[in-house]
Amino acid sequence: MRKLTLAIIGAASGIAMMSSVANAASCGKVSITEMNWASSQIITEVAKFLMEQGYGCKVEKVPSATTTAVASLAENGEPDIVTELWLNSTGDAYSKMEKAGKVERLADVLAPGGVEGWWVPEYLVKKHPQLKSVKDVLANPKLVGSRFNNCPDGWGCRIVNDNLAKALKMKAAGMEVFNHGSGETLATSIAAAYEDKKPWFGYYWGPTAVLGKYKMVKLSIGDIDKKVHANNSNKDIANPGVSDFPPAPVLTVVTAAFKKREPAIAELMSKVSFNVDTMNGLLAWKKDQKASAEEAAVRFLNQEKGTWSKWVNADARKKLSAILK
């Protein structure tokens, strides 16, 4: 697998030497975030490859995270591109920059957005087809093991889940709320349940390797009410309500200056969008193979030509098709 990756990159570098000269006038240096989680790193590697080999750019990856990326944009106007920006985690800082015209959103880089919710294993629904909603679970909590697997302390979902548990009166219904100590133990609890085909009920999100590997069914908590959900995101509220998790907008944004300077790259990045199920599959493969983000990106580029070829312009498509046969 690693040899395949290096062979492709090696072949690409030869073409890139010629194409970068031809494109030097049209694409210069580009900086893009390399966030500290797997899905964003794959997106960055795919975008980097397309920009370098298709458009002749010189791409710099900037190690980052949501809050630091937004702060850097506000203070320095860098990096040029921020991808997999979870809008519900940016607070007012990003919206102020957008209103001021300093940054522009180009694309929903994950479609239909980040997914959050309460899940049960598919095998449990096959065994108990009446389990279609959280209301069904609370009517007979023993079917799911009488336990709700909650987020660790410090996570935003922990606050929302705690408020939902109060609003739904879960403890009174006979449901234990088990607060995991880490994301690792939460993920392990799903793996252990699947191995033994045991009941499991709890919170999870995507795109993640877990949802890519294990077939889970998202149960309806209720209608989506954005005001109720926003209120549930606050600690120690007196009036928690019931609302399902709305899809989380996950964006690619650029500085206004970069969009003006590199319109062709801005157009490319406006089209780069990964289906959440596709990303789940890539993340599961990456974990199983102990692969790097670069290797996962190459897998995507080799297997999803019908997708990425629609993102690039005709000239870039010709160059990339010569590399990724």
Where are these predicted regions, by residue range?
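A bilobed periplasmic-binding-protein/Venus flytrap-type ligand-binding module shared by bacterial periplasmic
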Residues: 116-126, 249-261, 284-285
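A conserved helix-loop-strand patch within extracytoplasmic ligand-binding domains
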Residues: 102-152
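Short, well-ordered beta-strand elements
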Residues: 25-39, 57-62, 145-149, 269
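C-terminal lobe and pocket-closing loops
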Residues: 208-273
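Short, polar/charged alpha-helical segment
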Residues: 39-57
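Ligand-binding pocket segment of bilobal, Venus flytrap-like solute-binding proteins
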Residues: 71-73, 79-83, 154-234
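An extracytoplasmic/periplasmic, membrane-proximal ligand-sensing/linker region
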Residues: 28, 39, 164-173, 180-197, ...
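Immediate post-signal peptide segment of exported/extracytoplasmic ligand-binding proteins
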Residues: 22-32, 139-146, 309-311, 325
